[in-house]
Amino acid sequence: MSGGLVVQGNGTAFSNGKKTNASFDQIGGVYSMRTGRTSYLNFGFNYHKGRNFDYILNAANALNGSSLNNQSYAKGELGSEGKGGYYVDLDRSKPQNDKRRDFIGYSTPTSTDNALNFDQLDYLNFNTINTEKATGNHYGYNASAFDFNRAYTGYIGNYDFNVSGNLNNRVYLGITLGIKDVHYKSYSEYFEQLDNAQIGYANEKEITGNGFDITAGIIVRPVESSAFRIGAYVKSPTWYDLRAENNTQIETTEARALNPFGEIGNTYDYKFFTPWKFGISLGHTVGNYLALGATYEYEDYSTINSRINDGGYYDWYYDEYRETSSPDRIMNNHTKQVLRGVSTLKLGAEYKPVENLAIRLGYNYVSSAYKENGQKDPTLSSLGNAYSSEADFVNWKDINRFTVGLGYQIKKFNIDLAYQYSAQKGDFYPFSNLPAISYTTGTGATAKTTPNFASATKVENNRSQFLLTLGYQF
């Protein structure tokens, strides 16, 4: 059983986000039975927190004329979904004399189909600041600076059911069924200083759901007289079934805006399949006082499979309704362009100066999942974009983790204390820098292209974790 504290080393407290959070991380047990003179069969259950989302992100920088509402306006100027934008018109599903009609982004000037790249922020912008109240004309407004804060909370809980065994203390086999439980929440506020006004966006988001995966592995001692061992394992994708819900608001002091305030909420059910993971490990024990280990893992994040729930059927045998899904091919192609394979290296050592005391050291390196210039693409014709309520993103870099720990044994009772420090840098962008959403202003000889770029803002995710583990051997 393990628990402790997670402390964020940088950032400013915001909303319900805290820099120090208590965390219950693990509880489990193993039942072992002898199947031969030197062979055993083990049955285990383990709960552990696979991901802790508690984090506060703060960023502020100059914008030099670019703005989030300019991104929406530029997409509208492109005029059609095929060009990466949309055609803005009053809601065509309602009577023309209905004064409650909102502005919608359509796939073409004559279509009644909503463009899939007309996201929730585009909707809010065109029904407030991007539309002039007096004339109904559309405009974009420049900004000089931004301020951004987001508080993340929640976790992914892993419930692992394991069967393992060994053959003559030479070959060790194991298989694990993992059940995942997703609880993610975030709340963000984003403000821009316009030329003569201010604008703010608030977004509350929640993702819940579940998933499962399977892991199988083998460890072999090739030389009977040696403690040296070689291991290999493979982990299937985690097959997630998720629901994203949001409530997003906009407010501006721009006097020409169609409305000073707007709000939208949506729910999106989808499936998300993570990459396969492959690993190899080496280990060796020197006497009864020193243990050394090294592990290498590889996951290709460019193979992430985002899927659209597109129907379903009733399974009469199991008496339940089953959803069907298909790949979101446009989003998955974009994933291949911006993400890459991730390598993880784990090194560890344990030294016992006396029989019941252990000193442990560890180091982890995780390479970045993002290509150097990888970013969101708000022009994609994808349901993932249509339901998006966040324009910002962080291109996170490599992770370095350092661990030190002490373990003490009193008869059958074990006490372990550990400290881990994790450091990661990243580039924050309030919206995407994409030439495809640059637009032309003016006519004839005065025409010019006006890009909507934001400079990277350096951010960090540095955290310390203090962990206490208690164990008992029956």
Protein language model features and the residues they cover:
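Outer-membrane beta-barrel pore proteins
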Residues: 1-6, 33-36
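Surface-exposed strand-loop-strand hairpins of Gram-negative outer-membrane beta-barrel proteins
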Residues: 3-20
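Outer-membrane beta-barrel porins/channels
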Residues: 25, 32-474
